[in-house]
A protein has these predicted regions:
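N-terminal Rossmann-fold NAD(P) dinucleotide-binding loop
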Residues: 14
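SH3/SH3-like beta-barrel fold
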Residues: 143-145
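Cofactor-binding loop segments of dinucleotide-utilizing enzymes, especially the Rossmann-like FAD-
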Residues: 10, 33, 427
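Membrane-embedded transmembrane-helix bundle of lipid-linked glycan/lipid transferases
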Residues: 6-8, 22, 170
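Beta1/beta-strand and adjacent pyrophosphate-binding region of the FAD-binding site
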Residues: 1-11
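Conserved N-terminal/central alpha/beta ligand/cofactor-binding core
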Residues: 20, 26-27, 32-114, 118-134, ...
C-alpha cells in the first residue's frame, strides 16, 4: 500500500492534518492508539478550547468541526466570542463523520511497529552520498503497523495473528502522538533532553492535570450563588446561551488575586475534606448539551520534583493520587457549593492532561524571543496572541504572560532536522520551554496540523 501521508496520532493536531490533507486530495492514513479520535479533547476531557487571535490562519478545520458539532447540539459560542466550547462525547462522533467525508482512512487500536529509512537523495545529489549537506539527512521510506492492544511484544506471535503487519509506503510521515513517539523510535534529538543536560535545575515539564466531570448539578442555583459571591468578571461569568446556563469560574492557591473562593476552600481544608494540594488549581466550565454537568480542569498534580510524562512508574502513582483527589473534591463540593447537593462524579479522564513532554529539535527552534518580538516567517502555520501560560508546582510561581503583539510559528519548527519527510505537530514541536507554553492550546494545534497539510499538498513529488 502507498500513501501520500501517514499520520500517527488522531488527536487535536492529527485530526486537523488528516482532514485537510484528505480534502486536498492526498491519500491519507490516520492511525490512532485508542478506539476513538480526539486525543486530549476526548480522552483527557480537555474542554473547552481556549480563545485565541481572531487573525489566526489555517482555521478551516476548526470552523468545520464547530459547525458540525453545532448541528447536533455539541457546540456553543460563549459570550466572549469563543466558538470552542464543545461536548467531548459528541466530538468523537463528529470526528468520525468528518474523516469519512474527507476520504481519510482511519485505523484504531493501531501503532507503528517498524520504520524503514534510507539516505535522502534528490535529483540533484543522487551521486553525492558523501556530500556534507546531505550526509546526516535521511528519508522515511516505509512503515509497518501492528495492533496497539497486543500485550505480548513478540514478533513471531504478531506475524501469525496480526494481518496489519505489512509494509506501507508513504511520502510523508507525521508524528501527532503528543509525546513525539515516532521521533523517539528513530532516536531523534529532543530539546528537553538537551536543555536538561545544559541546566540541571531548569524546568522542562509542567504539572499535569486529571480532568473530570460532575453531573446532577443545579446550574441555575450554582450560577446565582457563584456570581453573587464573585464579582470579578475576569474570573467568573455566567450567561444564558441557546436557552441554557453556561458559566465558568476559577480559583488558585496563588496570592496574585483576591480570589472570592479562597474562604470556601480554606473552610474545606480546615474541616479535613480536602488538602491544600487539592486546592492548588480549580477551574470549571459548562458543557454543551450536558445541562446539569460541569467539566473540571483540575486537580493539578504537584510533587516535589518535575515528573516526566513518559515515566510510567511515576505517572501510574500520579493517576491513583489524582483519582483520590477527585473523590475528596467531590465531597467538598457537595458540602460547600450551592447547587451541588446531589452532584456526582460522572466521568474521569482516561488520560492525564499533559501540558508539555518531549519537544523535538527541528529545522528551526522557535524561541521565546521570537514570540515576544512577533518575528515574521516565510511559511507560518498559525497566528496567535495566547499568553505564555506556564504552570508551576510551587505556590506563586505560575506565570500567565500576555503578549503585546501577535506572533506566528514557522513550518520549519514542525520539520525534523534529521529526516527529510518527517514532521511533528501538536505540543511536541521544536520550541523552547517558554514558547511552547503559549503554543500548546487546541486552536494552535489545529492550525499546525492544517498548515502542515496545506504545505505538503503544495510540494512536488
Amino acid at each position: 500500500m502507498k500513501y501520500d501521508l501517514v499520520i500517527a496520532g488522531g488527536g487535536t493536531a492529527g485530526c486537523a492534518c488528516a482532514y485537510i490533507s484528505g480534502k486536498l486530495g492526498l491519500k491519507t492514513l490516520l492511525i490512532e492508539k485508542n478506539s476513538f479520535l480526539g486525543g486530549t479533547m476526548t480522552s483527557a476531557l480537555v474542554t473547552p478550547a481556549m480563545k485565541t487571535s481572531e487573525n489566526n490562519i489555517n482555521t478551516d478545520f476548526f470552523n468545520d468541526l464547530m459547525n458540525n458539532l453545532h448541528e447536533i447540539g455539541g457546540q456553543i459560542t460563549y459570550a466572549d466570542g469563543n466558538k470552542g466550547w464543545f461536548n467531548p462525547e459528541l466530538l468523537k462522533i463528529t470526528l468520525d463523520k468528518m474523516m469519512i467525508s474527507a476520504n481519510v482512512e482511519v485505523l484504531f487500536n493501531t501503532k507503528i511497529s517498524e520504520i524503514i529509512t534510507e539516505p535522502y537523495l534528490n535529483k540533484e545529489n543522487k551521486n553525492a552520498l558523501n556530500s556534507n549537506s546531505i550526509q546526516n539527512e535521511k528519508y522515511i521510506k516505509k512503515i509497518k503497523l501492528s495492533n496497539y492492544n497486543d500485550t505480548i511484544c513478540d514478533d513471531n506471535i504478531n506475524h501469525k495473528q496480526n494481518k496489519l503487519l505489512e509494509y506501507i509506503e508513504t511520502r510523508y510521515l507525521v508524528d501527532g502522538t503528543g509525546n513525539a513517539k515516532i521521533f523517539e523510535k528513530l532516536n531523534c534529538e529532543f530539546l528537553n533532553k538537551i536543555e536538561k543536560e545544559k541546566i540541571s535545575e531548569k524546568n522542562i515539564f509542567q504539572p499535569m492535570n486529571l480532568r473530570f466531570i460532575m453531573s446532577g448539578i443545579n446550574l441555575k442555583e450554582f450560577s446565582k450563588w457563584i456570581t453573587e459571591l464573585d464579582k470579578d468578571r475576569n474570573v467568573t461569568t455566567s450567561y444564558i446561551i441557546e436557552g441554557q446556563t453556561h458559566l465558568s469560574t476559577a480559583y488558585t492557591w496563588d496570592n496574585n488575586k483576591d480570589w472570592a473562593l479562597r474562604p470556601v476552600f480554606k473552610a474545606g481544608i480546615e474541616e479535613g475534606l480536602i488538602t491544600e494540594e487539592d486546592s492548588n488549581y480549580f477551574q470549571v466550565f459548562t458543557i454543551p448539551q450536558m445541562h446539569s454537568s460541569l467539566a473540571f480542569n483540575c486537580p493539578r498534580l504537584i510533587s516535589d520534583t518535575d515528573i516526566n510524562p513518559e515515566d510510567t512508574i511515576q505517572t501510574s502513582k500520579l493517576l491513583m493520587s489524582a483519582r483520590a483527589s477527585i473523590q475528596r473534591l467531590s465531597v467538598f463540593l457537595r458540602k460547600f457549593f450551592k447547587g451541588f447537593e446531589h452532584a456526582y462524579i460522572s466521568s474521569i479522564a482516561n488520560e492525564l492532561g499533559i501540558r508539555v513532554s518531549n519537544r523535538i529539535k527541528g529545522k528551526y527552534v522557535y524561541t521565546i524571543d521570537d514570540l515576544k518580538s512577533g518575528k515574521k516567517f516565510k511559511n507560518p502555520c498559525l497566528v496567535s496572541n495566547y499568553p505564555v501560560d506556564i504552570h508551576s508546582k510551587e505556590k506563586n510561581k505560575s506565570t500567565l504572560e500576555h503578549q503585546m503583539q501577535e506572533y506566528s510559528l514557522p513550518i520549519e519548527s514542525l520539520q525534523s532536522c534529521n529526516y527529510k519527510n518527517l514532521f511533528a505537530i501538536g505540543r511536541c514541536i521544536s520550541a523552547d520551554f517558554e514558547a511552547q507554553g503559549a503554543l500548546r492550546i487546541i486552536p494552535s494545534c489545529f492550525s499546525m496540523g492544517e498548515g502542515l497539510a496545506k504545505y505538503l499538498a503544495q510540494q512536488g513529488d
